[in-house]
Amino acid sequence: MLKNIPIPSPLSPVEGILIKRKTLERYFSIERLEQQAHQRAKRILREAEEEAKTLRMYAYQEGYEQGMIDALQQVAAYLTDNQTMAWKWMEKIQIYARELFSAAVDHPETLLTVLDEWLRDFDKPEGQLFLTLPVNAKKDHQKLMVLLMENWPGTFNLKYHQEQRFIMSCGDQIAEFSPEQFVETAVGVIKHHLDELPQDCRTISDNAINALIDEWKTKTQAEVIR
């Protein structure tokens, strides 16, 4: 400190000018105060900068959180819309499948194919074959007669009815094909597999949202550590 510094003369030369000791002590005292003031000001500025940085960090974090919340809400709404869309597509696919199968069983070649398979699988005894077909198959009567004569060695009786069923019998053997039942069964099989689609979409939605939440937590924690 200044009081421990020996000053042999009441006057000290400073840049060739004699300055009294009291004036010199008063000068150094003022200088110390200025230094302390500068140091304190620097400390206050440093603390203010740290506080501002902290406030910016929390403000950014709060804004980031709100941004993530908004994003999550939008993603959730989007994925929910996708689930709704999945249900609509399921209904459309079932309608399309029903139309497709109905058109297939109504096609003349389908009747001929079914009869051809039946005739091949039936035992061919000497008994008479009875065949009852939908009346709309009458337009293919000639083709049916050729098919029966080529594949059935015995006699046969062919008639038509107003129902949609194909019925063929010989002795104790009988076969029946219902286009309506076939269509319903086929559509039911497709529906069974499609029923898993909304659940798959829901699982994807949950996984996507959880992944976004995890990412948000990771980034938020990283900002806090900084």
From Swiss-Prot:
Known partners and oligomeric status: The core secretion machinery of the T3SS is composed of approximately 20 different proteins, including cytoplasmic components, a base, an export apparatus and a needle. This subunit is part of the cytosolic complex. Interacts directly with InvC/SctN1 (T3SS-1 ATPase) and SpaO/SctQ (the major sorting platform component). Forms homodimers.
Consequence of gene loss (knockout): Deletion of the gene disrupts proper SpaO/SctQ localization.
Gene name as annotated: sctL1
Keyword Cytoplasm: yes
Designated name of the protein: SPI-1 type 3 secretion system stator protein
Single Gene Ontology BP annotation: protein transport
Its job: Component of the type III secretion system (T3SS), also called injectisome, which is used to inject bacterial effector proteins into eukaryotic host cells. Acts as a regulator of the InvC/SctN1 ATPase activity. Required for invasion and secretion.
Transmembrane segments: none
CC annotations in GO: cytoplasm
Subcellular location: Cytoplasm
Keyword field contains Membrane: no
Record's keyword terms, sorted: Cytoplasm, Protein transport, Transport, Virulence
Superkingdom of the organism of origin: Bacteria
